[in-house]
Amino acid sequence: MLRLAGLLLCVTSFLSTSSLGANAGPRLDNDRLYRYSYSAELGLNRPTGSTRGNPGFRISSDVDISLVWRNPEIQDEQLLQVQISNVQVESAGKHSRKNNIFHGSSTESILGKVRLEALQRPFMVLWKMGKIRSLYAHKGEPATIKNLKRGVASMLMMQLKSGKMMEADSSGKCLVEYKATKHQVIRTKHLDTCKTQEKGFTTYSPVLGVSGKSASETVITLENGIIKSADVEETHILSINARHTAATKVLSRQSLTLKKIEVGPTEVAGKDVAGVVKSLDDKFMSVGVIVEKVKAKCKGCPNLMDTWKAVRSKLEPDSLSKAEAPRSFLTLLHSLRKASKAEILTVLRNCSKTALPQLVDAVTSAQTTSSLSAILEFLDFSKKEGLVLQERFLYACGFASHPTETMLQSLLDVSQGKIGSPDIKESVVIIMGALLRKLCLKGACELPTVVKVKELLLAGPDSTQVESEVQMYLLALKNALLPEAVPLLAKYAESEVGAYSTIAITALQRYDPVLITPEVKKTVNRIYHQNQRIYEKNVRAAAADVIMSSSPSYMEVKNVLLSIGHLPHEMNKYMLSKVQDILRFEMPACKLVQQVMKDMISHNYDRFSKTGSSSAFSGFMAQTADVISTYNLDILYSGSGVLRRSNMNIYGQSNNALLHGLQVTIEAQGLESLIAATADEGEEELESFAGMSALLFDVQLRPVTFFKGYSDLMSKMFSMSGDPINVVKGLILLTDHSQVIPLQSGLRASAEFQGGLAIDISGGMEFSLWYRESKTSVNNRGALVVIGNVTVDMDFVSAGVEVGFETEASLDFITTVQFSEYPFLVCMQMDKTTFPFREMVSKQEKLPSGQTFSTKRSRDQLVPGSEFPLHQENSNMCKKVFEQAW
């Protein structure tokens, strides 16, 4: 029994000792000086390609570390003195002597005497269990110098057992994983978890956004419990989702290697670390472990007025179809984001009338407190004369990449104030819906202003009897896509007013199918099948779209197929074409349609041989490794051959996200009297009307009316020039990504990716009673420039790499209808012109003394134009139309 007790006592003692050893942290010996060599290297480049000529620099030095004080109660809490000496700054890339900006420059001439002295001044590190708990340095030292010291201190971060934990070093507070063996520790930092002091922003849509991939690993070699070497490799890759070859790479390396151990200073006595630090140097103070923000100082940089003078000629209306317009827009945007309210107002008040709309686009797109305040003071919404500028401001708000609650509150204030133009009043409310959605997407749905606007829009349609105001609120809800609005939209979908029904149903079509409840499905089925009353054809067609795109049941699909043959003549052809398009383009409902078509009652020759001119067709605009772009064209005619609805959509898909890039809808009604024809059932009393509606980058814009009423129609017909009516024109900030990447070395990389689009969308409608012909056109002109740059500015040296691409393109959609005989001839054309495409990359290094090295390269190509293929029936019709015209 005694032997057993003794054995248990020995085992317990051994386990306790082992546990103590496992939990102990690394320690430095007393009276020892550990002499290390250290280097921190930065390289900037694209992810692939040669490293020759890449911008970057290397800072190398000696680092002496010694134990100053050890907590008598906690042996693993140690105060270390760290001193950097023999500093060298040189190029990290392979440069010829001619292109090496560091050649012939001393460290003091590069850093400056004050910075060099500060860098070589000793600092203190509180090291506990291998973790940096605090760092002590002189408060007055430059931020860049303190950050470099933080980078050196972070090399000591380690632990002697494996595990995961949140810990802070120079680059932020991150989840870190350790894998420890007797002689080696591998420290892997999960950079996607890091919380830093500087918050950036990014575009709400992943399709237009930027993707990042980062990695950080430290390999520490131990000898007798002392760090023999530590090597860090950290990479950050940022790429534009729409074109991943437009990408940048930040490579940061650090190395700490033990050279020798010498006799060092004796340990200082003291009870606590604060007292010991103060006794050593009363100028020491705790400065934190994480790198601090460095205020950029730009000597000789142009101010806002200088920038505006340099770019304004490129922003005149005649230049908007050229790539120089969005390029100048982005240059101006960067300057605006640094400018004060007073500077911005000065430029606004001294701008020509022709360039002012483009300046308003840029000021609003800047999305700073100063720019928003300046533009709101500049615009007077009580005056009708400023309609163009006011609408450009509102559209720029709608396209905002990262809107704030302040911007939404500003629009709410405008809507509640005096507004001179009813069109502007409509646009304000419609755009508030777009801002509401973007704020909710980034988790800000419960902010006070957001809640207030949400309540306003949900109550809006029922709060007024004015038709235009009801449409305004419904369009705002179409932008907002609030889940709470689904029942309200379903209610208005069954309205007796066709415009209400169309807006409500097309809004429901934009929702995630998960939110289309069984009750809503019953509603759209009632509308399509006219179970309770007769609806206009375009309303029924929109209802069919919702049915087929919202995870339909077998019976829903079967009933849609069975309806073909019992619809108005042109709608029969439209629905048949719609079903065939689902099959051909393999849409989500494709398999269910195939299953239903096995039933011969649903699928027979009589049903699938309906003739007419209406059609629906989908196709690919572009298919690349980065993005898939698709289009669809739907066109519905009345039985008399007059256009009822033309709908063109363009979508972009990337990174598992979908962007509704463009929708242009032309609607017409009540035009049968022009050709002495009979209106279709349910449309006999419709007022003559034609208009155009556009949705651009997920934002529904205010519809444009061509004419309304018979008298307006006749006056427009006799005065119509055939020139298209502008729907939207201006400069849009598509991509907008900004972030600061704090590196473990203490350096800070600033990343800015912006994409600017100059766009001009117009549409027109022409009638010729003499030739019994009508023509509708949608013209899209645009120039796109996307630029991404990453810079590291250390006050004493800066390095940067910039990538980008640009293009100019046009896309026209023309529909010609000849209704001199029946069946009437319809020709649809969708043409893309040959357009240029350019990719660019530039690199730069610069010293404050003025020495600069830079390179620029570009690659140009011409992308051939094409006419997008539609169905064979359309091709046959176009031949007949042009043969007759000839």
UniProtKB/Swiss-Prot annotation:
Q: Which cysteines are joined by disulfide bonds?
A: C174-C194, C440-C445
* Extent of the signal sequence: 1-24
Gene Ontology CC annotations of this record? basolateral plasma membrane; endoplasmic reticulum; Golgi apparatus
Q: Which keywords fit this entry according to its UniProt record?
A: Disulfide bond, Endoplasmic reticulum, Lipid transport, Signal, Transport
Location in the cell reads: Endoplasmic reticulum
Q: Which InterPro entries match?
A: Lipid_transp_b-sht_shell, Lipovitellin_superhlx_dom, MTP_lip-bd, MTTP, Vitellinogen_b-sht_N, Vitellogenin_N
> Start and end of every Vitellogenin domain?
28-662
Keyword Signal (UniProt): yes
Q: Which GO terms describe its biological process?
A: cholesterol homeostasis; lipoprotein metabolic process; phospholipid transport; plasma lipoprotein particle assembly; triglyceride transport
Which Gene3D superfamilies does the annotation name?
Lipovitellin, beta-sheet shell regions, chain A (2.30.230.10), Vitellinogen, superhelical (1.25.10.20)
Do you know what upregulates this one?
Answer: By elevated dietary lipid levels in the intestine of the juvenile fish.
The answer to whether keyword Disulfide bond applies is yes
Q: Name one GO molecular function term.
A: protein heterodimerization activity
The UniProt subunit note reads as follows:
Heterodimer; heterodimerizes with the protein disulfide isomerase. Interacts with apolipoprotein B.
The job of this chain, per UniProt, is described as:
Catalyzes the transport of triglyceride, cholesteryl ester, and phospholipid between phospholipid surfaces. Required for the secretion of plasma lipoproteins that contain apolipoprotein B.
The name this protein carries in UniProt is Microsomal triglyceride transfer protein
What organism is recorded for this protein?
Megalobrama amblycephala (Chinese blunt snout bream)
Q: What is the lineage of its organism?
A: Eukaryota, Metazoa, Chordata, Craniata, Vertebrata
